[in-house]
UniProtKB/Swiss-Prot annotation:
This is 2-oxoglutarate and iron-dependent oxygenase domain-containing protein CP2. The keyword Acyltransferase does not apply. Its EC number is 1.14.11.-. Disruption phenotype: No visible phenotype under normal growth conditions. The double mutant seedlings icu11 and cp2 skip the vegetative phase, flower immediately after germination and then die. It comes from Arabidopsis thaliana (Mouse-ear cress). It is found in: Nucleus, Nucleoplasm.
Length: 394
C-alpha cells in the first residue's frame, strides 16, 4: 500500500489520542506525582471564593512534587477564603489538595495514587545525565530570536518570528542545537536505565509504542515553566478561541520513529487544547506531519476541504504549534531515527465551558461552514419574503 493510499484509509476514521503516561482514560489532572497527601480528616467547611482575588500574589509551588500540576495550585490559591490566604504554604497545599481529591471519583483516586507511586520509584532511582535540563534556563534552551519575541510579548513580535503556512499551523525556530543534543542524550540515558533495571515504563499515549513521558522522570516542573512562560503567551494571541490564555496543565513526552521504533502515526486528534511539537533531531528521511483541518467532536470524521490540506517536514529545533483538535498524522520515517518532543497543553476552564456550548464555528471548520450556509439560507428566505411579487387581480 502506498503512503497516499495509507493516508487516505487513515482519514476515514479519526482517533482521539489519549495519554498522560497513565492508564487510558485517566483524568488529565491526576497524573502528577505526590509527596504530600491530604487525609479525609482535613475536610474543611470553608468554601472557595466565587471570584478570584486577583490582587493576591500566590506562593510558588515549582519546587514541590504534588498531586496536581503546580500551576493549578497557584491558580486555585486566588480562590481561597481570606483566612486561608494568610496561612503558610504547607497548610494551603493540604487545603487545596483535599478539595481537589474530594472531587475525584474513588477509582480515579486509586489510579492517581498508583501513578504517584510509579513516579516516585523512577525519581528516587533514576540518576539524570544532564541536571541542568531539569531547571529551565531560557538562554540555554531557546534561540535568541524566540527569546526576544517572548520578552516583547506582543502579537507583532510573535508574527516576526512565526510563519503560518496553513490556517492554524504555526511554525518557528525555538530550541538551541545544544539543548536538543542534551535532551537526546538524556532520553538515551533514561532508556539505558530502563533496560538495565528492566523497569516497565508507561508509554506516552494510546497510539505510540515507543517513547517516554518526560514528566515521569522529573521534567514536569521544567515543562510547566515552558508552558506558562513561553507557550501560553503565544497561545493567548493565536488560540484564544480554545483556551489559549488559560492553559493550566500539560502532558509532556517524547516519541521515537524509525527502525525498531514506531514507523508512522495514524490520523488523529490530540487530548489537548494546544499542541507543541518540536523535532529534537537525529538523521532521518520521511516522517512528514500531514494536517487535515480542525474539527469538534461531532464533526471529527467529516471530509477534508482542499484548503485544509498541508504537509510539514521536520527540522531539528523548529517548533510546530497547533490546536489539539487539528486533525493530523505522521507519514512513515523510511530511514534513520527521528525523535520529537511534544507538549500537550490543556485548559480546565475551556474544557468546562465547552460542555455548555454547541457552536464551535470559531475553530471547527465544519461548524463554520454549517453556520455560513445557514446564514445564506436565512438571507435568501428573507429576500424572497420581502420581494415577493404582488399578485394582480384578474
Amino acid at each position: 500500500m502506498s503512503s497516499e493510499q495509507r493516508e487516505g484509509s487513515q482519514e476515514t476514521t479519526t482517533t482521539t489520542v489519549e495519554g498522560n503516561g497513565t492508564i487510558a482514560g485517566q483524568n488529565s489532572h491526576s497524573a502528577a506525582p505526590t509527596t504530600l497527601r491530604a487525609t479525609s480528616t482535613m475536610v474543611s467547611c470553608q468554601r472557595l471564593r466565587l471570584n478570584p482575588n486577583n490582587e493576591h500574589r500566590p506562593d510558588s509551588y515549582e519546587d514541590l512534587q504534588l498531586d496536581f500540576p503546580n500551576s493549578v495550585y497557584s491558580s486555585l490559591e486566588k480562590y481561597l477564603p481570606p483566612n486561608m490566604l494568610v496561612s503558610n504554604r504547607d497548610e494551603k497545599i493540604k487545603f487545596m489538595t483535599d478539595i481537589m481529591l474530594r472531587h475525584l471519583p474513588h477509582g480515579e483516586r486509586s489510579r492517581a495514587q498508583r501513578h504517584s507511586d510509579y513516579r516516585l520509584k523512577i525519581t528516587t532511582n533514576y540518576q539524570p545525565l544532564h541536571k541542568e535540563l531539569y531547571t529551565l534556563v531560557p538562554t540555554v534552551c531557546f534561540v535568541p530570536a524566540f527569546l526576544k519575541a517572548i520578552n516583547e510579548n506582543t502579537e507583532e513580535s510573535f508574527r516576526n518570528i512565526i510563519s503560518e503556512p496553513s490556517p492554524g499551523v504555526f511554525v518557528f525556530d525555538m530550541l538551541q542545537p545544544s539543548f536538543c543534543e542534551m535532551m537526546l542524550a538524556e532520553i538515551d540515558n533514561f532508556e539505558r536505565w530502563v533496560g538495565e533495571t528492566k523497569f516497565r515504563i508507561m508509554r506516552p499515549n494510546t497510539m505510540n509504542k515507543y517513547g517516554a513521558v518526560l514528566d515521569d522522570f522529573g521534567l514536569d516542573t521544567m515543562l510547566d515553566k515552558l508552558m506558562e512562560g513561553f507557550i501560553r503567551p503565544i497561545s493567548k494571541v493565536f488560540f484564544s478561541d480554545v483556551g489559549g490564555a488559560t492553559l493550566d496543565s500539560h502532558h509532556g513526552f517524547v516519541v521515537e520513529y524509525g527502525k525498531d521504533r514506531d514507523v508512522d502515526l495514524g490520523f488523529h486528534v490530540d487530548d489537548s487544547e494546544v499542541t507543541l511539537n518540536v523535532c529534537l533531531g537525529n538523521q532521518f528521511v520521511g516522517g512528514e506531519l500531514f494536517f487535515r483541518g480542525t474539527r469538534c467532536e461531532k464533526h471529527v470524521n467529516t471530509a477534508t476541504k482542499a484548503d485544509e490540506t498541508y504537509d510539514y517536514c521536520h527540522i531539528p529545533g523548529q517548533a510546530v504549534l497547533h490546536r489539539g483538535r487539528h486533525r493530523h498524522g505522521a507519514r512513515a520515517t523510511t530511514c534513520g531515527h527521528r525523535v520529537n518532543m511534544l507538549l500537550w497543553c490543556r485548559s480546565s476552564v475551556f474544557r468546562e465551558l465547552k460542555t455548555h456550548h454547541k457552536d464551535f464555528s470559531s475553530w471547527c471548520g465544519e461548524c463554520f461552514c454549517e453556520k455560513r450556509d445557514e446564514k445564506v439560507r436565512s438571507i435568501d428566505a428573507l429576500r424572497k419574503k420581502l420581494f415577493k411579487p404582488r399578485q394582480t387581480q384578474a
